[in-house]
Amino acid sequence: MPNLLLTMWDTIKSSNIGILVAAGLGMFAIIGGLSMLSYHYTLSGIKSRTVGDGQHGTARWATDKEIRKTYAHVPFKVRDWRKGVSLPTEQGLVLGCKGKKDELTALVDSDDIHCLMIAASGAGKTAFFLYPNLEYACASGMSFLALDTKGDLARNYGSIAKKHYGYKHISVIDLRNPTRSDGNNLLTLINRYMDIARKQPDNLAARAKAEKYAKILAKSIVSPEGNSDHGQNAFFYDAAEGLLSSTILLLAEFLPPDEEHPEERRHIVSVFKLVQDLLEPARGARGRSRFQLLMDKLPSEHKARWLAGAALNSSEQAMASVMSTVLSRLNSFLDSELEQILCFDSAIDAEKFAAEKSAIFLILPEEDQTKNFMAGLMIQNLSRELFAVADENGGKLKNRVILFCDELGTMPPFDILPLFSAGRSRRLTMVPIIQSVDQLVKNYGKEGASILMDNCQDVICGGFAPNSEAADAFSKALGSRTVLSGSVSRGKNDPSQSLQMMERPLLTADELKSIPKGCFIVQKTGCHPMRTRLRLFLEWGITFEEEYRVEEQAARRVYYADQNALTRAIVRKYPPKLTEQKATRSVKGEGQLHDAPVQEMVVAEDIDYDRMPHKRTPYNLPRQEVDR
C-alpha cells in the first residue's frame, strides 16, 4: 500500500513539473517573439488603408450597389438589335460595361446630362467610346450629330443606321470632299415657312416661324461668340443682326423659284451678294444707299423694314459700318467648294431631326482649319432651332438628341455655354470630347472653361499623356481620403513604431497616367466616382458592313440672287402709287414732285438712264433710282 501511494505521488509530482516546464517554455517563446518583433519593424508593414473618420477626406469609389442604382444595366446584344429584337428602351450614354466578351452589359446613364470626355490622342476615343455609343443610339432610336475628323464614323455607321435600324434621314456633310456631300442650306427652314406664308397669307404662325429662324441664323452668324465682348460696339453688332435678318427674310419672301428662274437662289451666298450690292450709293439720290431705297419700296408695316430700322435710322457712315460688319461676318462663306454644300437644300432640318430618327455626320478636314467654323455654326444654329422646336412641344423634345462633339478643343470658339445651360432640360445632350482642359481655357478663357465643365454632369477621362498636367487637375478633382501612415525608429536597445493618419488623393497623377488603355474614370454629379472599362468595339460584338458613301456629283452650277430681281419682285407685289392730286399736277406740268416720298414715286423699271442719249431728268418727273 505504501508503495502505491509513493507511485501516485511521483506521478502527480512529475505531471506538475511538466506543466510548469511547458508554461515556462511558452512564456519564454512569447517574450522572445515579442522581442524579435520589436527588432524587426518595417515600413512595408504600414499599409495605406482607409482609417479614421474622414479627418483628411472622405473620397471613395462607388460600391456595386451604388453603381446598380445609378446606372441602367442593359445587355448589349448587337446581333439581336440589328434584327429588331430586344431593342433597349433606355435612352442615354454608355459609360462602362461589365461581363466578358460578346456577353457584355452596358452601364447607361439615362438622366438628362451633358458628358465631358477628356482623353489624349490615341486613347481610343473612337474605338472604345464612340462606336458603342453610336450603336446604342441607333438601337434606342435617338437622333444624333457626330463630328467626324477622319470620316470613319460616317463610312461605318451610315449604312448600319439605315439598313438595320430604319433611319430614313441620314446626312453626310463632307467638308473635305464637297462633291461627295449632302447639301446644307442654312435657310432651309426659313424658305419652307416663308413659302407657306406666301401661299397662305393668313397663316401668321408660318410667317412668325420664318422670322424666328431668320433671327436665330443672323445671331449665329454675327455673334458666334456671344454678345459679351461687343462693348461699345454693341450697337453695330445688334444693328447688323437686324439688317441680316431683314435681308434673309426679303430673299426668302420675294425670290422663290418660279417659271422664269426655276433654280433655288435663296441661300447664304446670295445674302452676301445682296448686301454687297445694296451697300453701293444710289444714283440720283444723294446721301442714300440702295438698301435705303429698297426699304422705302416696302410697306411701312413690313417686318423686314422694322428689323433693319436701327441701321436705316442711323447716319450714313454708321449704316455703312453696319453693312460692312455684316459683309465681314459673311466672308467665311465665300468658298467655291463650300458653295456646293451651302447653296443646295438640306436633307435634314431641325424639325425632322427632333421628330424622327435622324443622323448627321459632319466630316471636318484636319488639314484645313479654315472650315472648322462650319462645325461651330452648325452646332449653334441647330441647337437654337431645336430649342425653338422644344418650346413648341411643352419645353422638351419628343426624342432625345445627342451631339457628339469630337475634337471640340480644335474648333474656333463659339457661343456654346448657353447650349449647355438650356439644352439639358430639353433632352438635348452635349458630349464634348477634348484632349486637354487647356484647350477649353485657350478658346473660352478660364471662366468660360470653368462654366462649361460645371455644366457637365458626367466627366469621363483616361489615357493621359506622360507629361500631361490634366492628370494633376483630375487627381485633385477626385478628392482625398484618410489613410494610415507611420514611421519606424530604431534605437540601440528600444526600436519603436508610430502610426498616424494622413491625406492621400484617391488616385495620384502617376496612377492616372498608368491607367491601361480602355480603362476610364467616371465622375457623376451627386455620386462617388467609378472605375470602369470600355472594351474595344469588336468585343462588344460590333461589326461593320459595306461603307456608306454619298454618290459623286459633278460640280453643280450655283445660282445667285441679285438686287435688280429683288427690286422688281418687291415692286410687283407692292406697286408704288401717286396720289390723285400729285398725278394731276404731274400731268398738267404744274410743278415738280420733289417733295414726294420715295415710295410714292413712279418707278420706271425698263429705263436705263446710263444708255439714254441724254441723262437729263424730265422737268415734271423726278429721276428715280433704277435698281437692276
Segment roles from a protein language model:
Residues 420-422, 426-521:
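Conserved ATP-driven motor cores of ASCE-family P-loop NTPases powering translocation/secretion/packaging/pilus
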Residues 2-3, 470-477, 527-530:
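Short intrinsically disordered, low-complexity coil segments enriched in acidic
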Residues 1-123, 127-135, 140, 179, ...:
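Basic- and hydrophobic-enriched, low-structure N-terminal and domain-boundary segments
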Residues 68, 72, 82, 373, ...:
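A short glycine-/small-residue-rich loop at the edge of a beta-strand within enzyme catalytic domains
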Residues 56, 64, 500, 529-531, ...:
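General helical secondary-structure elements
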Residues 94-102, 106-428, 444, 510-531, ...:
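P-loop NTPase motor domains
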